[in-house]
Amino acid sequence: MEVLENCLFSVQKAMQTIDGEIIIVDNNSNDGSKESLPSKFWGVKFIFNNENLGFAKACNQGSKISSGDFILFLNPDSVLSETCLTDCVSFFKTHQDAGAVGVRMLDDKGKFLKESKRGLPSPSASFYKLFGVTAIFPVSKTIAKYYQGHLPENENNPVEVLSGAFMMIKRAVFEKVNGFDEAFFLYGEDIDLSLRISQLGYKNYYLGKISIMHLKGGSTTYNYKYVDDFYGAMKLFVKKHYNDKSTLYRLFLHAGISVRKMLSILALPFR
């Protein structure tokens, strides 16, 4: 709960010059948040679910009771800089083609998190990433496409995929795409949303000049369920967006996902 409190303090500080609201959607956590947070954070709106409804559905819940022109979806293990929100809003106002923006995420040691900017999981990009080739050629435009390794981490650029850990989106755009696809329980929903935003003709911008701290995995337990959810989401994405491709194309993707899932399961005892 301390992690979430630090997140809320940073958001409140970043909103000092912004007319906005903070909404917390709790997916049936058991850390005492329901009992203690409302009394500590006056003015924050809370939704407490009786069961874990998944990331996508929780985000949609929060968006429905929000009222701003921009909606920020933020993981609870994040800490914002004081100018982060105003800088993002300013970018939107000078880039009318922007549908959503993400930022440069750093871990608690200041290390850049590669998932801050990504490409779509095409067969080649997925193969290079899943089997470690990307790590050998981390700045190749072709081989490192999954993490957009050819784009400098501290520059602003349009990218194919933004991270759901920090995604600010225009309300009008979010409503046009009908929000997050709730078929994605956990993982993959940000890839799906990013793609649907671009299909409407808007751009997803990675803002490398704006940084936040993201305690990657702060609310994640690495176990079989995590592996199953993660690779299940990848298969769902393939089924939804690549169903018009050839059978061989889809078989290749599903085979790669299945092999990587098996390897991840085998590696669990060594994490």
Locate the predicted segments by residue:
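Active-site-adjacent helix/loop segment of glycosyltransferases
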Residues: 192-271
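Short, flexible, basic/aromatic active-site loop/helix in glycosyltransferases
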Residues: 120-159
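A short, conserved alpha-helix in the catalytic core of glycosyltransferases
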Residues: 152-211
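Short aromatic/hydrophobic "clamp" motif used to bind/position activated sugar donors
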Residues: 71
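Conserved donor NDP-sugar-binding/catalytic core segment of glycosyltransferases
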Residues: 79-115
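Short, acidic, metal-binding catalytic loop of nucleotide-sugar glycosyltransferases
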Residues: 9-19
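A conserved acidic beta->alpha catalytic loop
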Residues: 10, 26-35, 51
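Glycine-rich, basic loop-to-helix element that forms the pyrophosphate-binding segment
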Residues: 48-66, 87
